[in-house]
Amino acid sequence: MKQRLIEAQHITEDILNAPKFYFNELKPSMLLDKLAAVYAITDSTTGEVLYVGRTKNIRQRLYNNHLMGPKTNARLKKYLVEDPNQPLITDMLAAKEYLKANCYAQYIPENDMVKRGQLEGLLSYMLNVRYIHEEH
């Protein structure tokens, strides 16, 4: 058990020390295609982690979905629009502009699907993420 706690701390440090990809500079070519990973999106003005997710393709998820995608593919933008604490973010375009003006993403590669799910939950807790997927 103690070893798992140490590993959890190292994983948290790994994502916090990973390269930052600022949404205002993000281009698809900056991200590896078809790389499975767990990622965190952070508000650079406050340091608050807004969202933690997992994906089979980091390029598609961050660029095509979170930045450019519609409400159905971009959960974080949906959460921002629906957040009563974000009264200036009234639509998906405003949410996109907020991401570009304020946010960056960091990720750690992970090929194993089960471990990605575990890491998503772990990092959501360890980083005290603001937005969590609704339960079904």
Stretches found by the model and what they are:
Residues 95, 102-133:
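Non-catalytic interaction/Regulatory regions outside core domains
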Residues 16-17, 34, 74, 93, ...:
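Alpha-helical structural elements
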Residues 29, 58-111:
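Conserved short loop/helix modules at catalytic or binding sites
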Residues 1-67, 110, 114, 118, ...:
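GIY-YIG nuclease catalytic motif and its immediate N-terminal context
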Residues 20, 37, 49, 77, ...:
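Intrinsically disordered, low-complexity segments enriched in small/polar residues
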